[in-house]
């Protein structure tokens, strides 16, 4: 999403550089050659015309899936736009280019085991790339957390990851999560997506 400040500056420049209507008086000393005004308008049209058509996807975790993290679109503010598709729980990249890829999961639990030597609980979340260039899933983003031994009462741990990658048309983005039983599945806490830059 474009920050609001980035929208106002090009709009203001376009208004300032636009030629005045016939017969209108401009500010003294603020005349620009007609070619400069035309170039500014063309740049604005190019910027705003293409920015709305960039591929974007935002998926949320499916709370009905108990034994795996399944992604869903077209619900709870989730969407697939301008070429992205979801197939076999993977995002299919519609065109080659730079993409910001991101994901978040939130884990929760009632507490650690009260045993003298509690069993460690490891939580992990990874975004993977499957491409025609590789014969296996390549980790793009990876994070781990260890909870036990630790809190005696309820606990919550969140993992957010995001970075820019050069992706190729047809690449598949998927996730792998350890600690599925501890996922706190809600649209605002468990999500996965990508958008073209």
Swiss-Prot record:
Subunit field text: Homotrimer, and heterotrimer of either two LTB and one LTA subunits or (less prevalent) two LTA and one LTB subunits. Interacts with TNFRSF14.
Sugar-bearing residue positions: 88
Location, primary (coarse class): secreted
Record's protein name: Lymphotoxin-alpha
Keyword Cytoplasm appears in the UniProt entry: no
Coiled-coil segments: none
Function according to Swiss-Prot or TrEMBL: Cytokine that in its homotrimeric form binds to TNFRSF1A/TNFR1, TNFRSF1B/TNFBR and TNFRSF14/HVEM. In its heterotrimeric form with LTB binds to TNFRSF3/LTBR. Lymphotoxin is produced by lymphocytes and is cytotoxic for a wide range of tumor cells in vitro and in vivo.
């Amino acid at each position: 999403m474009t920050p609001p400040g980035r929208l106002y500056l090009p709009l203001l420049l376009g208004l300032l550089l636009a030629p005045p209507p016939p017969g209108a008086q401009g500010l003294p000393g603020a005349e620009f050659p007609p070619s400069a005004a035309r170039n500014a308008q063309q740049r604005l049209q190019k910027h705003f015309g293409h920015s709305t058509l960039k591929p974007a996807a935002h998926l949320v975790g499916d709370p009905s899936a108990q034994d795996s993290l399944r992604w869903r679109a077209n619900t709870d503010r989730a969407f697939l736009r301008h070429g992205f598709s979801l197939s076999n729980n993977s995002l299919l990249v519609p065109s080659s280019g730079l993409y910001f890829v991101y994901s978040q999961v939130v884990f929760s639990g009632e507490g650690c085991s009260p045993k003298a030597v509690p069993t460690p609980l490891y939580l992990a979340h990874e975004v993977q790339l499957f491409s025609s260039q590789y014969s296996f899933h390549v980790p793009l983003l990876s994070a781990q957390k260890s909870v036990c031994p630790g809190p005696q009462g309820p606990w919550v741990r969140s993992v957010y990851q995001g970075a820019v990658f050069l992706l190729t048309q047809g690449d598949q983005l998927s996730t792998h999560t350890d600690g599925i039983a501890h996922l706190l599945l809600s649209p605002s806490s468990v999500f996965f997506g990508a958008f073209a830059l």
